[in-house]
């Protein structure tokens, strides 16, 4: 279960060309969800403020004031220059962390503005449809951000303040992301269907092919970031740290747990997973390092402009074609369904209390699942058995994939209700023909969802009234 592009198998990806990389990234930036709100421990939050961005450009208080002018109006709501600057710097940071070269700002800025316009139009549509995200869902998202960065909520507040970011604005941004993500689920994802004929045709089309252009990879990474202007001594120390992490991975340590503990990449909260992509849409450095590896193989540390990367091959197959070896997950969950008598806030609070009892050793997960879960798995203590990739809805699977064995998630909301998830173990397994067809179904569903989303987003954007404003002289 994953959401906004939360379908791990078909995530939008970076091209090897700088501008194409930026455009592909822009398609995922606004709704990447709370897992992308990552902090880099060495430097605090990597989320620049409008004032900081403007100050870097103008270097004066007057420059900061100038950054507040309106650059566009979307159905009467303004987009300011400071918003564009903030989104621009975030985009550039993520491009760098992905190991791709930066395009010129003169090419990137117009695309950032257009993305902000599209996001604004979608947010307005969600609000006009009466969709809401309650305070408890936002607080759960904040806790997820803190947990993924291995800090407390109080420490998160401190880092936000140190970087000049108002906590209220941070919460507002999370609320907007959750709201538009739910709109996409309702308007796009749930309306996509895949027929048996679609699967048959897909499998026929994907048979054969050995060229790099037909190869698909699903990689996970751990990034040990190297700051700009680092001294040779600092670089050597960070390289040694990366090598130590690599040694742990080769020694059998869980890669997702290592990513959560050591990685400076935004993917740390999801176990380092970067999603299934055509090989030529990964950075060439990553492809060269992993193309000869088998599933489960490790590469690194590899040096890029962002730092030192450690890579693991999660899946490897012909593009779009289910592979023969997959990573299965054994998990269990507690589900509380939403109803007039049990709203999202109440369900989330109840599951948070159950999680606290389990972590304190006061209760057993399976016993609580039998007593409280409203899923068919309750009788089995919430046990979901061994699951192949794509078996659960995206918003569920995204969180599950980011958990290390025995780790328990925070309460998360899916289209079925509110869940508490615990991953028990993982293994690599050979897929049956039935499993391959199911995998093909999920790949097709993801592709169709992406195609449908692009068309839907264009329609929403096309219906919006947009007025561009000239910058003050």
Curated annotation (Swiss-Prot):
Major localization listed first in the record, in broad terms: periplasm
Top enzyme category: isomerase
Record-linked SUPFAM superfamilies: FKBP-like, Triger factor/SurA peptide-binding domain-like
Pfam families cross-referenced by the UniProt entry: Rotamase (PF00639), Rotamase_3 (PF13616), SurA_N (PF09312)
GO-annotated molecular function: peptide binding; peptidyl-prolyl cis-trans isomerase activity; unfolded protein binding
Residues making up the signal peptide according to the UniProt record: 1-36
The keyword Repeat appears for this protein: yes
Catalytically driven reaction(s): [protein]-peptidylproline (omega=180) = [protein]-peptidylproline (omega=0)
GO aspect biological process, one term: protein stabilization
Keywords: Chaperone, Isomerase, Periplasm, Repeat, Rotamase, Signal
Domain notes: The PPIase activity resides only in the second parvulin domain. The N-terminal region and the C-terminal tail are necessary and sufficient for the chaperone activity of SurA. The PPIase activity is dispensable for SurA to function as a chaperone. The N-terminal region and the C-terminal tail are also required for porin recognition.
PANTHER family: CHAPERONE SURA
Protein name, UniProt field: Chaperone SurA
Gene that encodes the chain: surA
């Amino acid at each position: 279960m994953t959401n906004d592009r939360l379908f791990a198998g078909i995530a939008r990806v970076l091209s090897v060309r700088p501008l194409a990389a930026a455009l592909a990234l822009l398609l995922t930036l606004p709704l990447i969800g709370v897992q992308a709100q990552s902090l880099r421990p060495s430097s605090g939050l990597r989320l620049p403020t409008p004032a900081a961005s403007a100050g870097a450009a103008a270097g004066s208080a007057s420059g900061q004031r100038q950054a507040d002018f309106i650059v566009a109006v979307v159905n009467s709501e303004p987009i300011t220059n400071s918003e564009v600057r903030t989104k621009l710097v975030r985009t550039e940071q993520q491009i760098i962390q992905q190991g791709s070269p930066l395009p010129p700002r003169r090419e990137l800025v117009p695309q950032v503005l257009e993305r902000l316009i599209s996001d604004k139009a979608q947010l307005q549509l969600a609000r006009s449809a009466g969709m809401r995200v309650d305070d408890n869902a936002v607080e759960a998202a904040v806790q997820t951000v803190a947990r993924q960065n291995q800090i407390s909520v109080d420490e998160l507040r401190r880092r936000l303040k140190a970087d000049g970011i108002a906590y209220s604005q941070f919460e507002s941004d999370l609320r907007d992301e959750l709201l538009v993500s739910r709109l996409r689920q309702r308007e796009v994802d749930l309306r996509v269907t895949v027929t048996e004929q679609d699967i048959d045709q897909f499998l026929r089309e994907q048979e054969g092919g050995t060229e790099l252009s037909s190869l698909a990879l699903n990689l996970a990474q751990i990034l040990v970031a190297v700051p700009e202007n680092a001294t040779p001594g600092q670089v050597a120390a960070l390289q040694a740290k990366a090598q130590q992490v690599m040694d742990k991975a080769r020694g059998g340590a869980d890669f997702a747990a290592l990513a959560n503990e050591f990685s400076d990449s935004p993917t740390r909260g999801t176990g380092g997973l970067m999603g299934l992509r055509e090989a030529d849409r990964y950075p060439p450095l990553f492809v060269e390092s992993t193309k000869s590896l088998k599933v489960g193989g490790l590469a690194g540390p590899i040096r890029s402009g962002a730092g030192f990367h450690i890579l693991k091959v999660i899946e490897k197959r012909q593009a779009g074609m289910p592979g023969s070896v997959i990573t299965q997950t054994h998990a269990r969950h507690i589900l509380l369904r939403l109803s007039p008598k049990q709203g999202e806030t109440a369900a989330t609070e109840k599951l948070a209390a159950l999680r606290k009892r389990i972590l304190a050793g006061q209760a057993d997960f399976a016993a609580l699942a039998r007593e409280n879960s409203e899923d068919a798995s309750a009788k089995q203590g919430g046990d979901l058995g061994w699951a192949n990739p794509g078996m659960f809805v995206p918003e569920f699977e995204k969180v599950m994939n980011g958990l290390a064995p025995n780790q328990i998630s925070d309460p998360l909301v899916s289209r079925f209700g509110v869940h508490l998830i615990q991953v028990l173990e993982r293994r690599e397994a050979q897929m049956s023909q039935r499993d391959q067809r199911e995998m093909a179904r999920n790949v097709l569903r993801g592709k169709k969802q992406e195609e449908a989303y692009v068309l839907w987003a264009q329609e929403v954007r096309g219906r919006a009234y947009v007025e561009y404003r000239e910058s003050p002289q």
